[in-house]
């Protein structure tokens, strides 16, 4: 996938920015976004930003535009094609996810739209369900806009760091630093993933074995995430971080 994106991105700057917008649009589009690995695509684009093949700010703007178009198309698809959507096999099989999304939108519409932007399965669903529920536009516009402003750089960030570290001049100290950075990134992402799993299990009541799993996953998630955060703080004192900061400042 990366080689395919590389060949497209090297064609021209305008074409490269267009790709960022298209990827952001498809990631946000109703149902289509469920089929795409958002973190993989956006992190790959972030790698190109990190190694200087893509400019950061034009990519960010393209990401915002693509994201907003995807959100608005999804909203109006839900608004005008509600009955057809209910007849889809996918939504029938995943009616629990649809019902849960509806419940969250009824209780906390603005927070759900904003937070849902950063969660893979709900990103392309929440705008569509908002339309299906005929959520007032004034409640949809602000969280959608804020989410679309924040989402691209956050999802670019792992790739940007990867792109920067790849281009660090090779020497034994730098190779050691790269492995440290990779381990820290894995710990943080795995800790976040485990925390999300723990949060879901936490809501399940009764059953003693569930209580045992819930308690243990919570502790494991806390230990792993804390280790990653501590590692991230400590690595700031590594000499190679000076190079990383300089390269990062040139990108921004």
From Swiss-Prot:
<protein>
    <recommendedName>
        <fullName>Uncharacterized membrane protein BUsg_132</fullName>
    </recommendedName>
</protein>
<keyword id="KW-0812">Transmembrane</keyword>
<dbReference type="InterPro" id="IPR032816">
    <property type="entry name" value="VTT_dom"/>
</dbReference>
<comment type="similarity">
    <text>Belongs to the DedA family.</text>
</comment>
<dbReference type="Pfam" id="PF09335">
    <property type="entry name" value="VTT_dom"/>
</dbReference>
<feature type="transmembrane region" description="Helical">
    <location>
        <begin position="217"/>
        <end position="237"/>
    </location>
</feature>
<dbReference type="InterPro" id="IPR032818">
    <property type="entry name" value="DedA-like"/>
</dbReference>
<feature type="transmembrane region" description="Helical">
    <location>
        <begin position="61"/>
        <end position="81"/>
    </location>
</feature>
<keyword id="KW-1133">Transmembrane helix</keyword>
<dbReference type="GO" id="GO:0005886">
    <property type="term" value="C:plasma membrane"/>
</dbReference>
<feature type="transmembrane region" description="Helical">
    <location>
        <begin position="29"/>
        <end position="49"/>
    </location>
</feature>
<feature type="transmembrane region" description="Helical">
    <location>
        <begin position="179"/>
        <end position="199"/>
    </location>
</feature>
<feature type="transmembrane region" description="Helical">
    <location>
        <begin position="141"/>
        <end position="161"/>
    </location>
</feature>
<keyword id="KW-1003">Cell membrane</keyword>
<keyword id="KW-0472">Membrane</keyword>
<feature type="transmembrane region" description="Helical">
    <location>
        <begin position="5"/>
        <end position="25"/>
    </location>
</feature>
């Amino acid at each position: 996938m990366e080689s395919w994106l590389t060949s497209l991105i090297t064609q021209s700057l305008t074409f490269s920015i267009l790709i960022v917008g298209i990827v952001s649009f498809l990631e946000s589009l109703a149902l289509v976004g469920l089929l795409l690995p958002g973190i993989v695509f956006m992190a790959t684009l972030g790698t190109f930003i990190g190694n200087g093949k893509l400019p950061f700010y034009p990519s960010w703007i393209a990401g915002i535009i693509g994201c907003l178009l995807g959100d608005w198309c999804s909203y109006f698809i839900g608004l005008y094609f509600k009955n057809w959507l209910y007849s889809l096999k996918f939504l029938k099989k995943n009616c629990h996810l649809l019902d849960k999304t509806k419940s969250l939108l009824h209780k906390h519409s603005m927070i759900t739209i904003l937070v849902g932007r950063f969660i893979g399965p709900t990103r392309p669903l929440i705008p569509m369900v908002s339309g299906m529920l005929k959520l007032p536009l004034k409640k949809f516009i602000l969280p959608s806009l804020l989410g679309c402003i924040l989402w691209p750089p956050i999802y670019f960030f792992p790739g940007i760091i990867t792109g920067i570290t790849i281009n660090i001049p090779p020497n034994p100290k730098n190779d050691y630093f790269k492995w440290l950075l990779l381990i820290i990134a894995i710990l943080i992402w795995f800790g976040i993933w485990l925390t999300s799993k723990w949060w879901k299990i936490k809501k399940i009541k009764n059953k003693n074995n569930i209580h045992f799993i819930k308690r243990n996953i919570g502790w494991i998630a806390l230990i792993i995430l804390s280790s990653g955060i501590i590692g991230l703080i400590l690595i700031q004192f590594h000499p190679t971080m000076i190079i990383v900061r300089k390269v990062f400042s040139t990108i921004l």
